[in-house]
A protein has these predicted regions:
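Signature of N-terminal electron-transfer/Fe-S-associated modules in redox systems
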Residues: 1-212
Length: 212
């Protein structure tokens, strides 16, 4: 019988050695980019650290929060779990491409006007998920919206305002309502009973001023 030998993986790297990099071709926001990546590099790190596209945020690094959502060939994808090598030749779309001009995308406008964003950390992921939903389904109902965003986590809004924002954006994209002006800044009121704030609230004794 022929001698059989156990399968062996690659030899471990010596202390101080770094994994060899490989140049991959990525199509990011319509532009071809060549980047040298390690076998273990994930797309999130490549976008942020190598290409300077920091709009995609890092949340859990475990695929549970959805903050890092990008489009990969049109499909919402968690960039923290996607190896950069596997994205080679695919169409990668990040939050930076949603509104390349001076005007906001209807989804971005709706998130502002409806109060769908508070701390803003999770917002890029929600916007990317919502844009993908409305591109394939221009008139989703509440259940379809909630299902689509179920992979995105928000610790601030409670989701109702996010759902409302998606519905408003969908109506604008269908031409049923006119685009509304975006708030002038992060302190702009979102509703008839909200008052604009001029300074961030601070606890007494924290060294800052409270609201005036």
């Amino acid at each position: 019988m022929p001698e059989t030998k156990p399968l062996r993986g690659p030899k471990p790297l010596a202390p101080g050695d770094r994994p060899a990099r490989r140049v991959v071709r990525l199509v990011v926001n319509g532009q071809e980019r060549q980047v040298a990546v390690r076998p273990s590099d994930v797309l999130l790190d490549t976008l942020r650290n190598e290409l300077g596209l920091t709009g995609t945020t890092r949340g859990c690094d475990m695929g549970t929060c959805g903050c890092c959502t990008v489009h990969l060939d049109g499909v919402p994808t968690l960039s923290c779990l996607t190896l950069s090598l596997l994205a080679e030749g695919k169409d990668v779309r990040t939050i930076e491409s949603v509104a390349p001009g001076p005007e906001l995308h209807p989804v971005q406008r709706a998130f502002l006007s409806q109060g769908g964003s508070q701390c803003g950390f999770c917002t890029p992921g929600f916007i990317m998920t919502s844009v993908a939903l409305l591109e394939r389904n221009p008139k989703p109902d509440d259940a379809e919206i909630r299902f689509a965003i179920s992979g995105n986590m928000c610790r601030c809004t409670g989701y109702n305002k996010i759902v409302e924002a998606v519905k408003v954006a969908a109506a604008e994209l269908r031409g049923e309502i006119r685009p509304g002006p975006a708030p002038a800044g992060p302190w702009a009121p979102h509703g008839p009973h909200d008052k604009p704030r001029t300074k961030a609230a601070r606890r007494p004794g924290s060294g800052g001023e409270g609201p005036r």
